[in-house]
Amino acid sequence: MRFAASIAVALPVIGAASAQGFPPPVEGVTVVKSKFDENVKITYKENDICETTEGVRSFTGHVHLPPDDNDFGVYRNYSINTFFWFFEAREDPKNAPLSIWLNGGPGSSSMIGLFQENGPCWINDDSKSTTNNTFSWNNKVNMLYIDQPNQVGFSYDELTNITYSTINDTVYVADFSNGVPAQNLSTLVGTGSSQNPWATANNTVNAARSIWHFAQVWFQEFPEHKPNNNKISIWTESYGGRYGPSFASYFQEQNEKIKNHTITEEGEMHILNLDTLGIINGCIDLMFQAESYAEFPYNNTYGITAYTKEKYDAIIHDIHRPDGCFDKLAKCREAAKEGDPHFYSNNATVNAICADASSSCDNYLMDPYQETNLGYYDIAHPLQDPFPPPFYKGFLSQSSVLSDMGSPVNFTQYAQAVGKSFHGVGDYARPDVRGFTGDIAYLLESGVKVALVYGDRDYICNWIGGEQVSLGLNYTGTAEFHRAGYADVKVNSSYVGGLVRQHGNFSFTRVFEAGHEVPGYQPETSLKIFERIMFNKDIATGELDIAQKPDYGTTGTESTFQVKNEIPPSPEPTCYLLSADGTCTQEQLKAIKEGTAVVENYIIKSPAASKGDPPPTTTTSPTAAPTAGSAMLQAPVAMLAISVLTALAFL
């Protein structure tokens, strides 16, 4: 697995707030000291930065946790300052349920989801103004976006001077004791976290422990959210295919310990009433999904033949051969079971075995795809992919925005420290205690709804692998889920947005013509799926009450592969300074480095880029089935780019 950083910089440094472009001092924040622990506090500020609907409130802030020498067995000698952005529901917030949103990475900010996928606003191409998102997920649900683990996005451990290279998308710790260096197109300065990989969670399970502490504080002590509805859901994406099952099952386990009085510490006995786990294009378990990295580029519903039969066979061989991907995964999991049963990642031998497994599988599965020059997050787009747009990075660089947010740090889309920490212990090769598919089964047995939603153009966590996960679960409803067929997802009177297999509380949905960030491609379809699940309706029509019909199952075909899609036109290239490594050509990067590029609102106007070649197809391109539809439902702005980098992070 490869990792990348991307920072939006308003150019602050510690002790240099008077310099032009630096965010002003944090002022006007409300401070709430915990009634349970004097060292714990919440700071927050109300604002209308993104949600401009009259009467609908939103708040940005941090939950501040001190170091802890025994965090459920984990020694944590660093502070955690976790950023949140809370949006009340546009309709009846007092009685609306609440959903947490988490992006993946590991190390990616949830501002990706907020601004590129499902939040109340889209950022326009001037990187300064917003457009209302009528398909926002806070239409009927209170939404809580969290940057986690520590050092991700606006979350931080300690304020640190940094420089940021737009050329290689990297953050460096800086010493400004002799003055702040001059800035140019390729080098920016700012304030961030320590960049210390030891000052953040080092695996998924430890991240679950941290987010549970955040939730205990926020749901008990954040004064602006006192609902009549105490249901909590988690929706997540990408590496969230691991976060979601692990976090939700950890919450559920802690609930059980609170109920049986195993946990009795004051301030840590709040029941988190779990309702739904939603996973969008999740990378859940390589044991189920590894083969899809060969299958999807070779045989997909768009007729794109990125791999030859020889390349496909070679990857499958590397997965199954002795000392191949599966062998290494099995050795890692056995070593972790014996040497790190509590998932502290403090056993150097286990860490080395699992890091080797993770790196080896990455090499076997993903290295061949680099040669295709196709998008990791959208196989129909070029590698330098200008969709969805990165304009929110410039937006979050504005001094006025940072002031309204009350943020002491610049925005960092990707936390390198988190990537290094997780990669160093081989987190992607490991399961948690039950395994992530076991977590999903446990949640279903506990009455929690689970929805797997996959856009059908994503390579990195593709729908073919996601479907294999859905069919590989072992729970009491397995046979009934397998017997269910695929039904159309009816979005409106004229559009079918995908196909869904559902039995009771469990579902798998393939969303047509969507890449990795499904709501950014198909806002209306995604909102319908989200709200139907959240309010106990069947996903196919939204007309049946699943709570009243727990044995409901969809009927239809056993497979969705017969429904083909047309390849969309390639997006217009847009080189964006704050996503240069993922959106710009080598010529443009050279001009940025030399300072000769012409830049307007962070967009490189000169030198211009030409549109990339279309993806390779089979001799006869498939025709779109009537149910697939070909009109992409997009935001009302020119949706352009998320970083798709040669150094890769799951979003």
UniProtKB/Swiss-Prot annotation:
Residues 607-627 are annotated as: Disordered. Residues 618-627 have a biased composition (Low complexity). Glycans are attached at residues 77, 132, 161, 168, 184, 202, 260, 299, 347, 410, 474, 492, 505. Pfam families: Peptidase_S10 (PF00450). Residues 1-19 form the signal peptide. Its main location: membrane. Substrate binds at residues 461, 517. GO terms for biological process: proteolysis. A lipid is attached at residue 629 (GPI-anchor amidated glycine). One of its GO terms (molecular function) is serine-type carboxypeptidase activity. It catalyses: Preferential release of a C-terminal arginine or lysine residue. PROSITE patterns: CARBOXYPEPT_SER_SER. Its EC number is 3.4.16.6. Keywords: Carboxypeptidase, Cell membrane, Disulfide bond, Glycoprotein, GPI-anchor, Hydrolase, Lipoprotein, Membrane, Protease, Signal, Virulence. It is a lipid-anchor; GPI-anchor. It is an enzyme of class 3 (hydrolase). It is found in: Cell membrane. Disulfide bonds join 50-121, 325-361, 332-354. The active site is at 238, 458, 516. SUPFAM superfamilies: alpha/beta-Hydrolases. Residues 630-651 form a propeptide. PANTHER family: CARBOXYPEPTIDASE, SERINE PROTEASE FAMILY S10 SERINE CARBOXYPEPTIDASE. Extracellular serine carboxypeptidase that contributes to pathogenicity. This is Carboxypeptidase S1 homolog A.
